[in-house]
Curated annotation (Swiss-Prot):
Family, as annotated: Belongs to the DNA mismatch repair MutL/HexB family.
Gene encoding the protein: mutL
One Pfam family, short name: MutL_C
Protein's recorded name: DNA mismatch repair protein MutL
Record-linked InterPro entries: DNA_mismatch_repair_CS (IPR014762), DNA_mismatch_repair_MutL (IPR020667), DNA_mismatch_S5_2-like (IPR013507), HATPase_C_sf (IPR036890), MutL/Mlh/PMS (IPR002099), MutL/Mlh/Pms-like (IPR038973), MutL_C (IPR014790), MutL_C_dimsub (IPR042120)
Organism: Chlorobium phaeobacteroides (strain DSM 266 / SMG 266 / 2430)
Keyword DNA damage listed: yes
């Protein structure tokens, strides 16, 4: 007698439900994707008890005939594909034909539907996958699916559901991710008889503001690039809007929400030193790609896609994000509050409105800030600035498809032409010849204060110089054009065993940077030449400190070798707080700073520039 037997359909469906239906949010995601595939222009989501008691999805899509409705709850019955070749051109969100039978097998399930042109609709009800009732009913065009008492017949699964607050959070994230991806659809959500939101217009900005706080969308940076292979569009958040989790990163491929480690890492790396450790940037990004170049059938919940050529996708994705970030001014406002995340308790009870309280400051370009500085400090004196693109007008919509573009991934202009040297200390009362410009000052030999067109700008001289040196070091190493000054008297440095190992690891890049070094004995190094930016007499201390910091960064931050070395070099070699600068040196530092690609933060993520507007000053003095 055969020991292997085919499982009954109701048992197979319950097993399948273990992968497809993990929690109420899984039910909602699958049903919403079906509604979108049915060309719905209006969708209403209703839940009770965080989806444990009730989940109901109402859409005005194409509806189904009686025959199609009955087939829809059969395993592997679908209208999305008919052959294996269809998987290569898949544009629908659903395609397996597993969701409805899996959901029906673990709930009290009801489907009511009516196609266009039919006089009556069809209603079908089943409990635990077993048919209970079917009838003709009056109905509007579209489909209504009601799921009650999820996992009522699988107590072990129901027991593992989390608290209502947790389950509601997952539900809301599922609905939000689709409402943002399909702004052309009217969305409404009701929880425990209270309306949470109702989006009647296709305004993506209205939705972002509703989800994250008033005027949130004003502080976002639009992204729009495309070529024959890939399109990228959407929005990026300012570094001040960072979160300590990646819940607020939405990446879509052909409008399908996905989780992709490669893209998430590329996004994180594109922000680079703008991010504080363990923080993640806000992102709402839509990637369009030929469906034949991806495989969406690699995850039970269809949350992952496999790219045919992942390297090419990253090669295009990373520079677009990097360039977009580099072209904007992220300097913090002096009166900005600390950005907040989701309000405490907001998701604990669905009767409260949801949202973030990020401070919405309209994004401006680096060239705008530099122009304000030049006009504030020098009036209408003409100035030259490396070519940065001005901020584009706020788009009326976002492209989520396959619009063509010619990518322009150029970097910013030359870094700088002047080398800063701290001058010898002078008494504070000693007048500086030529220091007659009243619009640039040094405060406590630590900060530079400048008048700008809109108010004032405060620059930390140490981290500003650090940013200049960092970008110069990266470029010099990558271009392999060392700029070294030879020492009249070579200096000898004794290294410990671990220091010498680090030295050997970075020796080639030290040469690229401008250090001319020669081994002299077991653990001794002769310094015969140094970079132009290193002050003679400091080379031994700087090299030793660089080796120490390089090792610390390697163990803590896992940085790429040249980035790590550039950080160490710039930090140890920058002018320090307490060093007096002449007016010309301050001007040179400011000009060099604004010629860098990212002038708003130092390589470690600390702010370089803080702005204080006239409006803020007026409010402080009670003028407004």
């Amino acid at each position: 007698m055969a020991k292997i037997a085919r499982l009954p359909d109701n048992v197979a469906n319950k097993i399948s439900a273990g992968e497809v239906v993990q929690r109420p949010a899984s039910v909602i995601k699958e049903l919403l994707e079906n509604a979108i595939d049915a060309c719905a222009s209006k969708i209403t989501v209703t839940i009770k008890d965080a989806g444990k008691e009730l989940v109901q999805i109402v859409d005005n899509g194409i509806g189904m005939s009686r025959q199609d409705a009955l087939l829809s709850v059969e395993r592997f019955a679908t209208s999305k594909i008919s052959g294996v070749e269809d998987l290569d051109s898949l544009m629908s969100l659903g395609f397996r034909g597993e969701a409805l039978p899996s959901i029906a097998s673990v709930s009290q399930f009801e489907l009511k539907t009516k196609p266009e042109g039919a006089l009556l609709g069809f209603r079908f009800r089943c409990d635990g996958g077993e048919p209970v009732e079917e009838s003709e009913v009056n109905a509007e065009k579209g489909t209504t699916i009601t799921v009650r008492n999820l996992f009522y017949n699988v107590p072990a699964r129901r027991k593992f559901l989390k608290s209502n607050a947790t389950e509601f959070r997952h539900i809301f994230e599922s609905v939000k991710s689709l409402a943002l991806a399909y702004p052309e659809i009217e969305w409404k959500m009701v929880s425990d008889d209270e309306e949470l939101f109702h989006f009647r217009t296709p305004d993506i900005y209205e939705r972002l503001d509703a989800f994250y706080g008033e005027n949130f969308s004003l502080s976002l940076i639009p992204v729009s690039e495309e070529n024959d292979y890939l399109s990228i569009s959407g929005f990026l958040g300012k570094p001040g809007m960072q979160k300590r989790q990646k819940l607020d990163q939405y990446i879509y491929v052909n409008r399908r929400i996905i989780q992709n480690r490669m893209l998430s890492q590329a996004l994180q790396q594109a922000y680079g030193e703008l991010l504080v450790e363990r923080q993640a940037p806000f992102a709402l990004l839509f990637l369009g790609i030929d469906p034949s170049r991806i495989d969406v059938n690699v995850h039970p919940a269809k949350l992952e896609v496999k790219f045919e050529d992942e390297r090419s996708v990253r090669t295009m994705f990373y520079p677009v994000i990097k360039r977009t970030i580099q072209l904007h001014d992220f300097s913090p406002d002096a009166a900005e509050k600390e950005p907040c995340s989701i309000k405490e308790g907001t998701l604990d009870c669905s009767s409260r409105k949801l949202g973030f309280q990020d401070i919405a400051e309209p994004a401006s370009t680096t060239s705008t800030l530099y122009a304000n500085y030049r006009q504030g400090a020098f009036g209408d004196t003409p100035f030259e600035r490396p070519a940065y693109a001005e901020k584009e007008p706020r788009p009326s919509s976002i492209n989520t498809g396959f619009e063509r573009f010619e990518p322009d991934l150029r970097e910013g202009g030359d870094l700088f032409s002047t080398t800063l040297q701290a001058r010898p200390y002078e008494d504070d009362n000693t007048p500086d010849p030529g220091e007659n410009d009243p619009k640039i000052w040094q405060l406590h030999n630590k900060y530079i204060i400048c008048q700008i067109k809109t108010g004032m700008m405060i620059i930390d001289q140490h981290v500003a110089h650090e940013r200049v040196l960092y970008e110069r070091a990266v470029d010099v190493m990558n271009q392999n054009v060392p700029n070294s000054q030879q020492l009249l008297f070579p200096q000898k440095i004794e290294l410990r065993a671990w220091e010498y190992e680090v030295f050997e690891e970075i020796r080639d890049d030290l040469y690229r940077l401008g250090f001319n070094l020669r081994s002299f004995g077991a653990k001794t190094v002769m310094i015969e030449g140094i970079p132009q930016d290193v002050r003679p007499g400091t080379e031994v201390t700087i090299l030793q400190d660089m080796i120490t910091e390089f090792q610390e960064n390697s163990s803590k931050l896992k940085l790429e070798r040249r980035e790590n070395l550039a950080r160490s070099y710039s930090c140890r070699n920058a002018i320090m707080a307490g060093q007096k600068l002449s007016l010309e040196e301050m001007r040179s530092l400011i000009d060099n700073l604004f010629a860098t690609r990212v002038p708003y933060t130092c390589p470690h993520g600390r702010p370089v520039i803080i702005k204080l507007s006239l409006d803020q000053l007026d409010r402080m003095f009670g003028r407004k």
